[in-house]
Amino acid sequence: MKRPRDYRSLVPELRDDLLAAQIDTRKLAKFSVAVIVTGVPTAGRTETVNKLIEWLDPKYVTVRAFGEDDEDDEYPVMWRYWRALPAFGRIAFYFWGWYGDYMHSALDDSHQAKRRTVRQLERIRRLEAMLSADGVRVVKIHLDLDADTQRKRLKKLRADKLTRWRVTDDDLRLARHHKAVRKAIERCLAASEQRAARWNLIEGADEDYREVRAGEVVRDEMLLGLERAQKTAQVRASKVAKVAPLPRPRIPKVTDDEYDDELERLQARLALLTRRAKFRKYGLVLAFEGMDAAGKGGAIRRITHALDARQYQVVPVSAPTAEERSYPYLWRFWRDVPARGHIAIFDRSWYGRVLVERVRGFAAPADWRRAYDEICEFERELLEHDLIVAKFWLQVSKAEQLRRFKERDEDKLKRFKVDPEDWANRTLYDAYQAAAGEMVMRTNTRQARWHVVPADDKKSARLHILQTLCETIEQGLSG
């Protein structure tokens, strides 16, 4: 591309292209654009983003800058980035985005920092692969600047009392070590380069060139997103492959008197565990899955009776809303991740993608097959933040499920619990069992185990869940 003399002639057409691509992206609403802007001090990050917003319709653009925030320390590392994702049809600009901590660590020569960068890089690569596969165009722009130009710009900014505030001690430190910083950043860019999210290196010395080139990058990514979104494959129900059947542990039945006594004892135990001072540094995430009428709601109520109402949230999960469908799949679950010292109880969960969406054909095969690894990474993020994860599959037999359906139909107070969707799912009982078997096999990890609970006897199942939950919390707090 020719340099400054062509700038004014290029801008009108580029602005038209950007606006047209943005309008088409918004109307189609099948993908979003997340633009990460990094760069050395005074390379023009702010000026470039401001110019791009000027060229676009700002009503459908958001800008985020992530700094240190006490609230963010209460949540897993990637929580704030997931919550800040743009909805399909929108564009978001991020100053440094999820690269801020990574590049900051890369500039530190200590052994601890080097170890930290390994996991940070892994997180970034997995996040970008996940987003790119699930409707987010990840655009990465790095603005570079030679040492002489940087030195002159810093000097000019510091000489004017109206702009002096823009130069931080970090800027000066990085400028003094320009060569080393540049090499470290180059290593970061190379390590985080991947097919789904490539880096665009733009020279920042020439303001006109920098802005036009950045605009072209954003335009081209939107056009590519529009082209690919038009080729969406038709979703069909998938045949469920044969896998090992679900484990069927045996739990003893109890009398009514035994149930009442044991329930009181276990609820007291749970109440004490979740009120311990140490628990404030942890947190708890519970996922309940199972066939319809398996007793998930009743089990959850026996848990919440032991908890402080200010401490927990029950999250009922049903078919995604229009808003939830306009984000990557896991976004809706990241929203409800609890802070330290709190509890989130999911009545159905992120496993819906490999259960109902798979069996009923609501998700494309490529999406649910990819979901196993994405779910394991999601749970790993929770565990690394000291959130204790417990997952329960309530296993009810076909005959017992039918008995409960009929019982509910005959009870006016319970009739609302059974709808046509439940009966439709019942005809696919065997397919759900096979899908659940593969789910347990592929997502059962050492720290986030599946607990398969025989649920034909509700009282025995509730006691078993409470007992298992208390043991899981005790293990988590002692780790």
Task: Go through the PLM ranges and name each one.
Residues 1-479:
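Glycine-rich phosphate-binding loop of ATP-dependent small-molecule kinases
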